[in-house]
Amino acid sequence: MQPKIYWIDNLRGIACLMVVMIHTTTWYVTNAHSVSPVTWDIANVLNSASRVSVPLFFMISGYLFFGERSAQPRHFLRIGLCLIFYSAIALLYIALFTSINMELALKNLLQKPVFYHLWFFFAIAVIYLVSPLIQVKNVGGKMLLVLMAVIGIIANPNTVPQKIDGFEWLPINLYINGDTFYYILYGMLGRAIGMMDTQHKALSWVSAALFATGVFIISRGTLYELQWRGNFADTWYLYCGPMVFICAIALLTLVKNTLDTRTIRGLGLISRHSLGIYGFHALIIHALRTRGIELKNWPILDIIWIFCATLAASLLLSMLVQRIDRNRLVS
C-alpha cells in the first residue's frame, strides 16, 4: 500500500473546491450586463483564481501515474464506471427536471458528454492511456524552467498574439495543437515538480507571488476582453492558457512546500469525496439556479449560498454513494 502523500490530498481538496467555485460564479461572469460592475469583478476574481483546478487534477494524476507506477486495469474500470454512473445520473436529472433533449444527448454520448462537466472523465482517460509509455525523469530546475517558459508561454498557441508593426513575435509557432497536449504536459510537470526538492522558503514566496500576479492578470485580461468586445470571452480563462499554466505550477509548488506534513481535516474530507462532489455538483448548481433557489438580489450572499449549498449537498450524496459503493468504484 502506498504511503499517504499529504500534499496530494490537500491539493486535491483545494482543486475540488475550486471546481465548485468556477461553476458557482459562472452565471455572474457570463451575464455582465445583468449585474453590477462590482459584483461582476468579484465573481471574475474568484473564477480567475479557480481556473487552476482542472490543470491541478491532471498534475495530480501525472504525479501518481507518470513514474514507476502506471495506470492499472482497475483504474480504467473505475474511470469507465464513473462515466457511465454519472452520465446515467445526469440523464435521469435531464429527463425529470429539464427540457433538454435526452434522445440527442444519448446519440452524442461518445462525442459530447451528457452534462457539461463530465468532459473531464474523457480527458483524464487519456492520461491513464499514455501512462504506461511515460516515466518522467529527474530534471534540473533550470532545464524545467526553460521548458515551461517555451512550451507554456512562448510557443503556447493560446498566448494572446503580440505584434510590433505587423510582426507577430508571440506566440512562436512550434506546431503545438490541441488541449490534450497540455493535459499530458500538466501530468508530466506534476510528476517532475513532485520529485524535485522544492523545499525552499524563498521558492514558496515566489510561488505565492506568481499565483497572485497570475490571478490578477487573468482577471484584468478578462475585464479588458469584456470592455472591448462588449461581452464575456474566455480568452484568459482557458485551462491551457499561459497565465493559468503559470498559476497551476505556482500553486502546486506552494501547496507541496507548505501543506506536506499532514492532511488538513476539511481538505482531507473533500479530497476523499472529490470524485462524488465532482460528479454531482454541476447538477445541483443547475437545479438551484433554474428553480430560483438563489439570492440574486444579494449577489455576494448568493455566491456564498450556492457554493456552500452545492458543496454540502454534493458531499452528502457522495457519502450516501460510498455507503453502497464499498469498493469505491464511482465514489
From Swiss-Prot:
Keywords (A to Z) from UniProt: Acyltransferase, Cell inner membrane, Cell membrane, Membrane, Transferase, Transmembrane, Transmembrane helix
Record-listed E.C. numbers: 2.3.1.-
One annotated GO biological process: enterobacterial common antigen biosynthetic process
Compartments it resides in: Cell inner membrane
UniProt topology in membrane: Multi-pass membrane protein
Residues in the Cytoplasmic compartment per record: 1-12, 67-78, 135-138, 190-202, 256-266, 321-331
Domain of life of the organism encoding this protein: Bacteria
Enzymatic class: transferase
Coiled coil: none
The UniProt record lists the keyword Lipid metabolism: no
UniProt pathway annotation: Bacterial outer membrane biogenesis; enterobacterial common antigen biosynthesis
Periplasmic topological segments: 34-45, 100-113, 160-168, 224-234, 288-299
Transmembrane region(s): 13-33, 46-66, 79-99, 114-134, 139-159, 169-189, 203-223, 235-255, 267-287, 300-320
GO cellular component, one term: plasma membrane
Major subcellular site: membrane
Similarity field: Belongs to the acyltransferase 3 family.
Protein's job: Responsible for the incorporation of O-acetyl groups into the enterobacterial common antigen (ECA) trisaccharide repeat units. Catalyzes the acetylation of both cyclic ECA (ECA(CYC)) and phosphoglyceride-linked ECA (ECA(PG)).
Protein name: O-acetyltransferase WecH
Organism of this sequence: Escherichia coli (strain K12)
Lineage start: Bacteria, Pseudomonadati, Pseudomonadota, Gammaproteobacteria, Enterobacterales
UniProt gene name: wecH
